[in-house]
A protein has these predicted regions:
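Hydrophobic alpha-helical transmembrane segments of multi-pass integral membrane proteins
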Residues: 1-178
Length: 178
């Protein structure tokens, strides 16, 4: 099969990203296990509050695998399958837009989850059990910054997926060479 060079570059970039995010997911799982041990259930931290404190960090493991590894692998497979079925290749500029939106957006989303998870776990370890006050202190208490950073991360990730999905959908109806 003749794979366009811009597809090869995308495959290489997205596969490397998936490998890195698999490692991040594994390390996030290990760090969660070790960090949760340091914030045990106690009189100051009953079971329900313990779950509320460690859950943000627990979710990083699965999200890193899903949005950082499995989804990029599925998208690379989808693009390759489209080529093998004779769909019109997606343009280099479109793939570049999808890459530069999705990969940083998903990496930032996972990084934000790590930050939030450790914000909660470390807060509990140092005796902060007033969760409303601790949540208000997130991002130094700057709610506008918090909303902006989360908004940028999720918008970039979603826009990257949308660009790729629309381009793939348009290419499905046309055979290569049309």
């Amino acid at each position: 099969m003749n794979i366009p060079t811009h597809y090869r570059a995308l495959y290489r970039t997205w596969l490397r990203f998936a490998i890195v995010m698999m490692m991040v997911g594994l390390l996030a799982g290990l760090s969660f296990e070790e960090s949760a041990k340091r914030a045990p259930v106690s009189d100051l931290l009953p079971a329900g509050k313990h779950l509320e404190a460690v859950l943000p960090l627990a979710l990083v493991h699965g999200h890193a695998f899903l949005i950082g590894a499995l989804l990029p692998l599925a998208l690379v497979f989808m693009l390759h399958l489209g080529l093998s079925m004779g769909f019109r290749p997606i343009g280099e500029k479109t793939l570049r837009w999808a890459t530069w939106l999705y990969l940083p957006g998903s990496a930032l989303s996972v990084a934000l989850m790590l930050y939030k998870g450790y914000h909660w776990v470390l807060g509990v370890r140092f005796g902060h059990t007033d969760f409303a006050a601790w949540d208000a202190a997130f991002f130094g208490g700057n709610h506008a910054l918090r909303a902006a950073v989360y908004g940028v991360a999720h918008t970039a990730m979603s826009a990257g997926l949308a660009v790729l999905a629309v381009a793939f959908w348009r290419g499905m109806g046309k055979q290569a060479g049309d």
